[in-house]
């Protein structure tokens, strides 16, 4: 019995190293906050310089493009961004930023048509990468991650394996004041082996924590005060993630590092804080009659006609519920 317990103890100690050994070493780049504009040639020149320098580095396995690829989110400019990104020798993966959603002239449909979708998923040498939209979903609103994307993330990580390393890719930081339901995301992904969130939006390097989970924001690709564009480089080693800034024509500079084996947060814990819902108690005469979880985002008021409630969602469905008890009657 003692021998069996010793073997089990040793297996428990060795398991993290076994998981660690399953991934290989590699390097990838991150370009963010490109801000192409029909009225300003500088962002185009900046991206072309970054693409040329990335193409000159044989060790880049792929490129993450983390949002705000345009200034105003219009279809014509997004097509020009794609033409430029297509010059990359390495495969690239792209997500939306707030500039693609706030001022979209297509109701946020053009991005998916041009780039093949609003999120991405791939596994590279033992690490799972998941990229998703962090909003906003209405003009000038806070960022928001829709329920179907949160559900998609957890389903993908379940298939991949809870103990295997995952890197999540967004535009916004998952912070109060940036994303209104940040806590829903961090609570949902906490049980998994999240090694890092990668994002942009702030136009400068930031090393953050999202309810304990490490998060990186990379500088904008736009030229800095010295007139130099720049992007991020990530080296994945056997036990670490090394983060660099790469200014055009200069050696890369490391400014952050993260362990691939050591824990950063309690996988059984909760968000550090939650929104204040005390306003719901200010009207004691108003009583909750029923609640339905639709599994989709709803950004408009329901319509009531006689004994029925009609609700439209961001997946394109109109659903009818019974006013009395919330029973789903139909949808299309």
Language-model features: where?
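N-terminal active-site segment of His-dependent metallophosphoesterases
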Residues: 17-80
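Extracytoplasmic/lumenal domain signature
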Residues: 265-299, 303-332
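Active-site glycine-centered loops adjacent to acidic/histidine catalytic or metal-binding residues
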Residues: 33, 67-68, 97-98, 171, ...
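Bacterial Sec-dependent N-terminal signal peptides
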Residues: 1-23
């Amino acid at each position: 019995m003692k021998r069996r317990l010793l073997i089990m103890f040793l297996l428990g100690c060795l398991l993290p190293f076994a998981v660690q050994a399953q991934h290989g070493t590699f390097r990838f780049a991150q370009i963010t906050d490109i801000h192409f504009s029909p009225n300003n040639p500088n962002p185009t020149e900046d991206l072309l310089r970054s693409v040329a320098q990335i193409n000159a580095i044989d060790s880049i396995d792929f490129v993450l493009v983390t949002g705000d690829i345009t200034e105003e989110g219009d279809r014509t400019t997004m097509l020009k961004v794609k033409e430029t990104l297509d010059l990359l020798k390495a495969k690239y993966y792209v997500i939306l930023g707030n500039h693609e959603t706030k001022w979209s002239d297509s109701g946020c449909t053009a991005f998916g048509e041009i780039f093949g979708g609003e999120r991405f998923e791939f596994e590279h040498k033992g690490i799972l990468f998941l990229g998703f939209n962090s909003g906003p979903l209405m003009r000038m609103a806070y960022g928001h991650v829709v329920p179907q994307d949160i559900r998609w993330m957890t389903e993908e990580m379940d298939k991949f394996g809870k103990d295997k390393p995952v890197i999540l890719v967004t535009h916004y930081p998952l912070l109060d004041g940036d994303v209104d339901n940040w806590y829903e995301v961090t609570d949902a992904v906490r049980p998994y082996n999240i090694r890092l969130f990668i994002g942009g939006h702030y136009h400068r390097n930031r090393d953050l924590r999202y309810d304990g989970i490490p998060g990186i924001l990379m500088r904008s690709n736009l030229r800095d005060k010295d007139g130099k564009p720049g992007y991020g480089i990530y080296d994945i080693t056997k036990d670490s993630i090394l983060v660099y800034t790469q200014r055009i024509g200069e050696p890369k500079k490391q400014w952050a590092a993260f362990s691939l084996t050591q824990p950063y947060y309690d996988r059984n814990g909760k968000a550090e804080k939650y929104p204040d819902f005390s306003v719901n108690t200010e009207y004691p005469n108003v009583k909750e009659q029923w609640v339905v979880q639709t599994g989709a985002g709803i950004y408009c008021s329901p319509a009531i006609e006689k004994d029925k409630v009609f609700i439209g969602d961001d997946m394109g469905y109109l659903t009818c519920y019974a006013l009395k008890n919330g029973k789903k009657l139909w949808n299309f």
